[in-house]
Amino acid sequence: MAGGGGELTAALLKKTAENGGEEKDELGLKQKVWIESKKLWIVAAPAIFTRFSTFGVSIISQSFIGHLGPIELAAYSITFTVLLRFSNGILLGMASALETLCGQAYGAKQNHMLGIYLQRSWIVLTGCTICLTPVYIFSGPILLALGQEERIVRVARIIALWVIGINFSFVPSFTCQMFLQAQSKNKIIAYVAAVSLGVHVFLSWLLMVHFNFGITGAMTSTLVAFWLPNIAQLLFVTCGGCKDTWRGFSMMAFKDLWPVFKLSMSSGGMLCLELWYNSILVLLTGNLKNAEVALDALAICLNINGLEMMIALGFLAAASVRVSNELGSGNPKGAKFATLTAVFTSLSLGIVLFFVFLFLRGRVSYIFTTSEAVAAEVADLSPLLAFSILMNSVQPVLSGVAVGAGWQGYVTYVNLACYYLVGIPIGIILGYVVGLQVKGVWIGMLFGIFVQTCVLTVMTLRTDWDQQVSTSLRRLNRWVVPESRDVNQVSSEE
């Protein structure tokens, strides 16, 4: 883009920000909180419901498989918690680059760029997914090398082949979600996710209980449940649901792929280090004594923690959208206030859930298993589960702020240091050397999360939001394609 165009864009955004700032300054604190909370919940509520529904697909599958036997449950847990989370972390992290780009572009009124960014992200993520496929094909040797029991691995490698289809479903799923969230149009995602969850419950019962197809029935239903919402999202995006931001397939999608790839890689590094953290917890537990019971109990705890995490991840998405929109529109005060509102709201919910799960203890485990030994182990781990829920109510929101501002590269180093140089070594010492077993491993890893949360809090408090606005403008002006140049379209909408 020419220098004059960049200066004009910056001037317009500065004027918009000044006008918006004057209007907001006239409002009282309660009004500001109310207005920002509404904007936050417009994104957060559908995002939370969607994540609950998506996570519910895995929970329902696990509940049905858990009644087949402890070996099947352990195999499913290790496949989804280790292998699928490995690729999920990479792909979701890489897709978060789209969240930064679309959010800031939408705030800057560069609506035509959202569709181009979406198509670039499809290209980058599809290539990455193809590269990840051998992990599932050779899952047996990989899991054995990681020290897992052979009888569990025999079942896990069958499940892993089914998961290849699920892995490819993440490409349209994550990218369309980021694209729609940036425009606060993610209600459609919640609707189709609800339908998909209902279909999954029915298919799971039909194939596993009525026809007794076992693992095959469970994975068939799971695969359908993951792909059904994607088809609906793609139709919504490309068939008129986003006329202002989707202008048809464009040859400009093949331009500037390398910068998008680099931003996607830094985004992937940030989030995958985070998601892999729990996978390593499962791997370390699999090498402890009585691994079958320990794995089952930990899988149940992590699923409960994961359900609460869906709330925090909803606020991660909302914080990212709000911060990126405000930065793109040139409003540093708005970005800062959006951050404070998101953190406070998520933390308040986290405190309530902290006390709820302290009270429930092991009672909830009977949803997933009939084993008394596993239920007793879950009850023993429940205080750690409650503290994990409390800390996870803040940390993902701060990560969302980082995504909205484009700090993924910095947070990657923070995650690497706090999780892998602090949390895991302490967990290994407490679990294996001190002999605290699962508790010791989890305590160490919770300490890593605590340190990471403290570092992100300091980073956020010390942020110069005016400087972040300037950085956002430079990024947008560097990659923007003027609407008049976007003529090489395969198709377009009137």
From Swiss-Prot:
Keyword NADP included in the entry's annotation: no
Keyword Endoplasmic reticulum: no
Record membrane topology: Multi-pass membrane protein
Record-listed N-acetylalanine modification sites: 2
GO MF terms, alphabetically ordered: antiporter activity; xenobiotic transmembrane transporter activity
Family: Belongs to the multi antimicrobial extrusion (MATE) (TC 2.A.66.1) family.
Name listed for the protein in its UniProt record: Protein DETOXIFICATION 21
Source organism (scientific name): Arabidopsis thaliana (Mouse-ear cress)
